[in-house]
Amino acid sequence: MALGLSRHGYRRLLVFLAYPYWAGIIEAQWTPLIMASAFFPLLLPATLAKPQLGLPVALTTPTWRGVLACTVLITLSLLVMPRWPWLWAGHFYLYNRFVPLLIVPGPLLALALLRYRDRDALLLLLAALMPQRWFYDTFILWLIPKTRREFIWTIFFSWGAGLYRWYHAPHSYVEVGRWMVLFMYLPMLAVVLLRKAAEKPSIATA
């Protein structure tokens, strides 16, 4: 992931200071590898490990090599265990979750549609539509910042959720979702909306 980030400027390495990165590392999550797949197409099959997080990345950074790699992996997995999609779907109702867009003030994230031609806005909106459960799930949002200022401010706000988690045990996933929206999603929305049209790069370029 560090190699992919540094290809477009060392300022992107600031992402390792974001609270969701450390939350994911502590819990041994897939999110860093899913983010890396945005820079290395052959890693795109990693998005299949957590489809609810991988789908926004896969849809906003598609390449023929990545799609081919995913197709091969899915085909092989079906040959080994043909029933796995039904087994996976059968456990979905057990997944404690929330959808950021549906938790107040999450509906504000629909404002990303004002920048519908910007792939960063699309990534933000797709992520907000996906079921999530903890702070590390937002790490893919750090594909959105491009400038040093954008990284610094979004990282700063992310630690608001970190401090909250440190001093307060959330009572529900809805409560977790509200703090995720406030400290991760809304700052990213501000980045997308305030970025000048001439400064709108693609997700994987700077």
Regions from the language model: what does each represent?
Residues 1-43, 60-206:
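Primarily membrane-embedded glycan-assembly and transfer machineries that use lipid-linked glycans
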Residues 45-60:
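Internal transmembrane alpha-helix with an interfacial aromatic "cap," most often the third helix
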